[in-house]
Amino acid sequence: MSLRFVIGRAGSGKSTLCLHEVQEELKQRPRGETILYLVPEQMTFQTQQALIGSEDVRGSIRAQVFSFSRLAWKVLQEVGGASRLHIDEAGVHMLLRKIVESRKDGLSVFQKAAEQNGFFEHLGSMIAEFKRYNVTPSNVYEMWQQLDAHSSSAEQKLLANKVYDLQLLYDDFERALIGKYLDSEDYLQLLVEKLPQSEYVKGAEIYIDGFHSFSPQELEIVRQLMICGARVTITLTIDEKTLAQPVNELDLFYETTLTYEKIKQVAREEKIEIEKTIPLMEQPRFHSPALAHLEKHYEARPNEKFHGEASVTIRTAANLRAEVEGVAREIRRLVADEDYRYRDIAVLLRNGESYYDVMRTLFTDYNIPHFIDEKRPMSHHPLVECIRSALEIISGNWRYDAVFRCVKTELLYPLDVRKETMREEMDEFENYCLAYGVQGKRWTSEDPWMYRRYRSLDDTNGMITDSEREMEEKINRLRDVVRTPVIRMQKRLKRAGTVMQMCEAVYLFLEELDVPKKLEALRIRAEESGDFLFATDHEQVWEEVMSLLDTFVEMLGEEKMSLSMFTDVMSTGLEALQFANIPPSLDQVLIANIDRSRLSNVKATFVIGVNEGVIPAAPMDEGMLSDEERDVLSAAGIELAPTTRQTLLEEQFVMYQMVTRATEKLYISCPLADEEGKTLLASSFIKKIKRMFPDVKDTFITNDVNDLSRSEQILYVATPEVTLSYVMQQLQTWKRYGFEGNLDFWWDVYNFYVTSDEWKQKSSRVLSSLFYRNRAQKLSTAVSRDLYGDKIKGSVSRMELFNRCAYAHFAQHGLSLRERDIFKLDAPDIGELFHAALKRIADRLLRENRTWADLSIKECEHLSTVVIEEIAPLLQRQILLSSNRHFYLKQKLQQIIFRTSIILREHAKSSGFVPVDLEVPFGMGGTGSLPPMEFSLPNGVKMEVVGRIDRVDKAEDENGTFLRIIDYKSSSKALDLTEVYYGLALQMLTYLDVVTSNAHTWMKKGHAASPAGVLYFHIHNPIVEVKGDASEAEIEKEILKKFKMKGLVLGDADVVRLMDNKLSTGSSDIISAGLKKDGSFSARSSIASEQEFNVLQKYVHHTFENIGKDITEGVIDIAPYKKGNKAACTFCNFKSVCQFDESLEDNQFRTLKDMKDSEAMEKIREEVGGE
């Protein structure tokens, strides 16, 4: 029994010496004693390759490469102890979830924390850490007693409570495992116990290579290996000079020096012979003087400078994507120009979550074979999502999001269905569920679902059309596709008495859905498309899910569990599932994490993402215990994993390892912005490298090739997939600026795409964008007639929409596009309710031959309640009756109608105007409808403007009959003559024109009427600020002012007094007008003469004719208006259709100048030739 150390700096040949010794031994004595070669898990594959890579050693039974966990498995198979069931990480998390749920009421700190994402991952890691550091539940309990007895501050009490919770959960976890199960850490503890019994290890020659430190548990394994083996050789990265000096925590080799001392101490305790240490002083790894210099002087202070041509490259990239593309281009260049193999190259990084997806995509596009040494979670695979969402459906009362997450996995689809068709049908089905607010009991009820197109609150026709019946049948068929398998599982889960039966219910759910066959079809499809990674994913996920169910049954099969706990435990297990890495092929670029990688024999290393806070890592508290808490436990005798401070001290060694992996070339790069465009800073580590290599120039990597030289641009010509975007970029620049520059070879590349049989069609769509203009072509007369017909019948809102943006009009009224209906109460629904409520009250008053002025406050309240109760079942598929929240909203809406009724009562008392009718139709046909506003357009097309007027009021005096329009609005609005001029606000003046033009036939007395004005009435329940001692009457007066109607009224004092008979001088509280003492109008009055009203009405006719002409002649310009801070695009539903983009030359707003009313009126006169 002996111990031997092989030490040396990085690249000194420690591993090479050991491998050569083993290979020589195998050549000399192929059947001798066992040779064990122990390495970290991530080194096993490459070490195995290196061991049998010699021409004289093509295979071996005598020498085997192991990690500690693989050695444990080997020994336990030999001597026994492997009969207990192994539970993986997913099983550990599931067991911990069950333990926490059963212990929840007794936990002090973790009761609420258990609901946070990642809690069980942290808890599992904490327990694994306890085991690695030989900390038992009794140790933790004793620590709690000690802390509890001396806790005085809040921080100390928190730590004591946290340790108490950990002790409870750790103890329960160990009790659940004992005699039945083994987790990954238990294997190592069993290895310690079983090694003395192993004949396989006894007398073996043992090499331990690639480690820098050992946990206490691993140190015990090393102890037993020294006792059982013939000789143990351990390699450590240490400079021999370091061993001759006192241990200093700031030393580069501090961690490995401590490891060296700990192992020597173990050897002394076991009286193991310590052979003479073998120090390696040369640097055989490095073929580059610059890299040798970097390794030799890495920790020197001040930095030793290297002058001359260096094989170190420093690169700064515009963004993360540019950085990765720069790496990909350089890899291709090394392979093409310098005879590198892909396996000679490695990419090292730390923040993989930011890089891996980008690297997979770009390396595939660049045709670079690669292997990412990182396990991927299975959580996004359709099978995992299907199980998780199906259980959420059942436990969460069939919520919309859970149902359609399950649907979108496509595993509920029948096996033989055409997926494209089913997807379209399910999209329609989802639209139905959103529109009707389907959830909860409606899914499980046997009552068929109804489908009716919503028309209006006044539509009481109960007849169903053929198309509605057809849609209803489809919806109920699709409902059964979705709900039938889930309901079957729901019934089985409710009948289940044990966890085993619940797991069986999940299994039967998957079997009845033919999931194995569906996954096999997905695997075949992935293989046919060349995506072998995803093909293996579909195989792995079924095996892992079945293993998870088996583990669940093995651990908790006979226990009873509530459905909610079963769902939580199962979800926790599913979240922990990971895809196993496929072993790398013989020729791939290795992409690995800096902290976990153990590279050897790579010629070139790319270290990417070298940003501040990443390399070196910023201090960060993670896990269950903070640094301060770990220090307290350490002081009390419980050794755990290093604190953040200790980790930061070790960071220099990590970076040293990082830059000493390559033999020939080192590339260091960082992006200046992340994927979202946020600024990133270069690491101080890059500054250090620059000080060591002052002649190395920092190269900037960009995806914009315009500023690059011709030789640099040529490097951007890689695979057809990635080069296409650069061709586009260059030719777009040429098109926009006419710059020739280096375009000669880019035209050659362009010619490749347009002449290649393979790429001609693939590239045509992309290249056609060179000539793309986001300009809508005018419709032909034939197409216009097909879309709109020979007679246009449209509302005023439609005409205004055309003037806001002709393309939006085309999308809505030509193509009939609309957003999908969602079961929610929007502003238009509330507006419709307000109109209907006020009309019902007004109709009741007319039937009773009463006016608003006749109502009492109590009657206002009663009537508002009655009409809201009548309307609620009719509005938006009974949305106001669908939930407590909507019921509360219904009450608030009733209060608004109540308040509005009171104001209308006050207005009526103060006004000589009385309502003639409400919701007055024109051009709608039927009894009581006024005729439309008709136009014969120059191209022969007839156009009718139709609509419905909220309210028409009438007043009479010795000067005749006056009519005014009142429009109810749920938001504050005024009439802007600038908007009238631009055709954006035509509604009120159109209504006034319709009623005054038809007054002689419409009014009972049969004589003409004059325009009195147009006014907006804001329906709301305002809050007013008053002094503390204000009376109720004063409060009501302030509220009344909030309802002042804005608009435009006839500039006639008598007519204005008819609107507010309390007005003598000053401003009216009812309308936006006021009188001076001399009888003239105040400056802030919104008034117009009768002649001006006539001019405005002519202008409205003129505008409609122009709109009609443009519509029928096919104008669909993408030309939205912009006026001040208002723009047509702000609330437009069709932005994704027109793709309006101000950066394009063709896409610019029609900027409308804001004007004073007087200026707008003057321009209107000019247009119609008014006086």
Curated annotation (Swiss-Prot):
Q: Which Pfam families does this UniProt record tie to the protein?
A: ADDB_N, PDDEXK_1, UvrD_C
Q: What else is known?
A: Despite having conserved helicase domains, this subunit does not have helicase activity.
Cofactor(s), by name: Mg(2+); [4Fe-4S] cluster
Q: Where is the UvrD-like helicase C-terminal domain?
A: 281-587
Quaternary context: Heterodimer of AddA and AddB.
A molecular-function term among this protein's GO annotations: ATP binding
Q: What is the species of this protein?
A: Bacillus cereus (strain ZK / E33L)
Coiled-coil annotation reads none
Q: What class of enzyme is it?
A: hydrolase
Q: Name all UvrD-like helicase ATP-binding domain ranges.
A: 1-390
**What keywords tag this UniProt record?**
4Fe-4S, ATP-binding, DNA damage, DNA repair, DNA-binding, Exonuclease, Helicase, Hydrolase, Iron, Iron-sulfur, Metal-binding, Nuclease, Nucleotide-binding
The record lists ATP as bound by G8, R9, A10, G11, S12, G13, K14, S15
Positions binding [4Fe-4S] cluster in this chain are C805, C1129, C1132, C1138
Name the UniProt record assigns to this protein? ATP-dependent helicase/deoxyribonuclease subunit B
**Out of the domains of life, which is the source?**
Bacteria
Q: Which GO terms fall under biological process for this protein?
A: double-strand break repair via homologous recombination
Record family assignment:
Belongs to the helicase family. AddB/RexB type 1 subfamily.
Query: Any note on cofactor binding?
Result: Binds 1 [4Fe-4S] cluster.
| Function summary | The heterodimer acts as both an ATP-dependent DNA helicase and an ATP-dependent, dual-direction single-stranded exonuclease. Recognizes the chi site generating a DNA molecule suitable for the initiation of homologous recombination. The AddB subunit has 5' -> 3' nuclease activity but not helicase activity.
EC annotation from Swiss-Prot or TrEMBL: 3.1.-.-
Quote the gene name from the UniProt entry: addB
Q: Which InterPro entries match?
A: ADDB_N, DNA_helicase_suAddB, DNA_helicase_UvrD-like_C, P-loop_NTPase, PDDEXK-like_dom_sf, PDDEXK_AddAB-type
